[in-house]
Amino acid sequence: MFKFLNYLFPLSLLILLPVHAAENPLFEKLNEINANPQLQKAAYNAGKDRAFLCKYCHGVDGNSVKGSIPNLAAQNPAYLIQQFHLFLKKKRISKTMNEIVKNLTPDDMLNIAVYYSEQQVKPQKPYKPDLLSKGKELFEARCFTCHGKDAYGKEELPRIASQPSEYIITTLSSYNSALEKRAESAMSKIARTLGDKDIEAVAAYLTSLK
């Protein structure tokens, strides 16, 4: 069940400046959990209890209930911890999330990240399958270096495989137009090389991944 005990951080569309372990002690605690099955099980169960705060948008099992909202299922735990930190510090802006994180303790953030990282992503409905080939070509040319060949991410970069197509399109379009509040130079520069049809193709490809 607890697949991430087999690696240290399977760490992964939204590139942000990393919050390194030296700046966030929760990364060290995540390391400890990875090395201790009992701690891991306790964190998972505690995270499952606290995830009720997230289910109305992200789903009980981390599979989004709205196309505009990202899946949290199978997301990299270090990335989720990083995002909690950014929402808390208002370095990432979302009225809903900025309020929710106020009600979370550091341990809540860690435990929720552990819980969602262990959930399975449900297959997405096919989105414009005729664009898959072009989307794969664009992904391999522009995205895989950071997000990995399977789009599972790495380090503190997110898993973008199996995300809802609407979410991918909206986010890439925001980066493209510099409206994205998290806009970071690397991601913005890449997004600005993509036209509307390119973005649709990338979304079609990422949505098709499992």
For the regions a language model picked out, list residue spans one by one:
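Sec/Tat signal peptide C-region and signal peptidase I cleavage site
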Residues: 17-21
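C-terminal capping alpha-helices of c-type cytochrome domains
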Residues: 23-29, 33, 102-124, 166, ...
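Electrostatic cytochrome c docking/interface patches
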Residues: 22-51, 114-138
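The canonical Cys-X-X-Cys-His
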Residues: 54-61, 112, 142-150, 202
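Bacterial N-terminal signal peptides
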Residues: 8-16
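Gly/Gly-Pro-rich "capping" loops immediately C-terminal to redox-active cysteine motifs
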Residues: 44, 62-92, 98-103, 136, ...
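Bacterial N-terminal signal peptides that target proteins for export
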Residues: 1-9
